[in-house]
């Protein structure tokens, strides 16, 4: 039986660590990398007689997220105790939200795939609620024992729960990437997956197309997009194989082993009633006035979806280019800063050329140098000056790469005219004068009679060889379009 006989159903629960300086219910620091247990307050380690105090910054970030996804921000929500035993949970319960979460509903539009096969899909969200993180168990440095680090206990989390709207690992990864970009865009989470600031749990089940939902298994704590895709793909094949072999899927929590590429059983999956949720008597209901929500809404930056639409409408970019430029806040900021110092009048080639250079040459060079775009040696103004000279025909794309390399190496000085200084200093201005090009073309035709004869015999590749010879003779300065036109005219004569 083929994979097409089954429908995959995926929902994600994402834990985004909120970037507050202190914890959600105590004044202890949330800084990463401290020595074990030096950032655990009396509240975090559950000493008798201490009470939690809610961090308003965590609430503000939850509101910001709710506004960004078009959700309902609850005017009143309640904190609840989620009761379970684990060594790194000193209270014996986790403070979370259950029946009345702070964010309800909302949606995120994702783009899946590339090129002609790419499509957009809207994933509905169920809720997002505030909760505290647990501590961390340490096993590597102990023999026959485990250590407990409570530095992370009490760190503020926003748990973001999607509807089971995704039908493939590709859709799940696209959703996770879009969510990751959004929480960084609105500055509520640093998104550092290596440090555990953005962790995914995937609920996966399979069913016959149109049939009832199957039994789900939850894959816990996936901290990379690659592992998310691999884990879901393995789990889907495992579930299909189990059912087709006559077995039954049992509700369970599983872990993904990156070394084997397989999921393995962690424990049977609990339901909500197993946690005996009840309102936390130490915390009043969270009341959010409408004025607070209105203020947060007024302070929101332009969101990726709106910016993408603006890039398409105002600059004529393709949906792919606009999506790529708005995939991260830093990339979008660089591109907009570049346009701010360039000619963007209607009909200008600069926006499209600039997009190509930001996503092409600049991105490739940054990747090779292992640098972020915010640390680029080529400033937005310098790139704007370079792109402007390509657009007005001063230099060709090939020459532009030489100018870009010089800019990268710190030549030309600062500002939008840095490219101009390099062009003049190195004599790189493109030759557009037909009277200057004609002798070069005549020399190439005279010296390459074989290629001329081959072209006239119908071999198109011979024409490209002749163009290459002219460009070589001009040391790359000839206008390629003009060379093409003049060569064709002479060869057709």
UniProtKB/Swiss-Prot annotation:
It comes from the Bacteria. Its EC number is 6.3.5.-. It catalyses: L-glutamyl-tRNA(Gln) + L-glutamine + ATP + H2O = L-glutaminyl-tRNA(Gln) + L-glutamate + ADP + phosphate + H(+); L-aspartyl-tRNA(Asn) + L-glutamine + ATP + H2O = L-asparaginyl-tRNA(Asn) + L-glutamate + ADP + phosphate + 2 H(+). It is an enzyme of class 6 (ligase). Keywords: ATP-binding, Ligase, Nucleotide-binding, Protein biosynthesis. SMART domains: GatB_Yqey. GO terms for molecular function: asparaginyl-tRNA synthase (glutamine-hydrolyzing) activity; ATP binding; glutaminyl-tRNA synthase (glutamine-hydrolyzing) activity. The keyword ATP-binding applies. It holds the Pfam family GatB_Yqey. GO terms for biological process: glutaminyl-tRNAGln biosynthesis via transamidation; translation. Belongs to the GatB/GatE family. GatB subfamily. PANTHER family: GLUTAMYL-TRNA GLN AMIDOTRANSFERASE SUBUNIT B MITOCHONDRIAL AND PROKARYOTIC PET112-RELATED, GLUTAMYL-TRNA(GLN) AMIDOTRANSFERASE SUBUNIT B, MITOCHONDRIAL. HAMAP family: GatB (MF_00121). Heterotrimer of A, B and C subunits. NCBIfam families: gatB (TIGR00133), PRK05477.1-2 (NF004012), PRK05477.1-4 (NF004014), PRK05477.1-5 (NF004015). Allows the formation of correctly charged Asn-tRNA(Asn) or Gln-tRNA(Gln) through the transamidation of misacylated Asp-tRNA(Asn) or Glu-tRNA(Gln) in organisms which lack either or both of asparaginyl-tRNA or glutaminyl-tRNA synthetases. The reaction takes place in the presence of glutamine and ATP through an activated phospho-Asp-tRNA(Asn) or phospho-Glu-tRNA(Gln). This is Aspartyl/glutamyl-tRNA(Asn/Gln) amidotransferase subunit B. It comes from Aromatoleum aromaticum (strain DSM 19018 / LMG 30748 / EbN1). The lineage of its organism: Bacteria, Pseudomonadati, Pseudomonadota, Betaproteobacteria, Rhodocyclales.
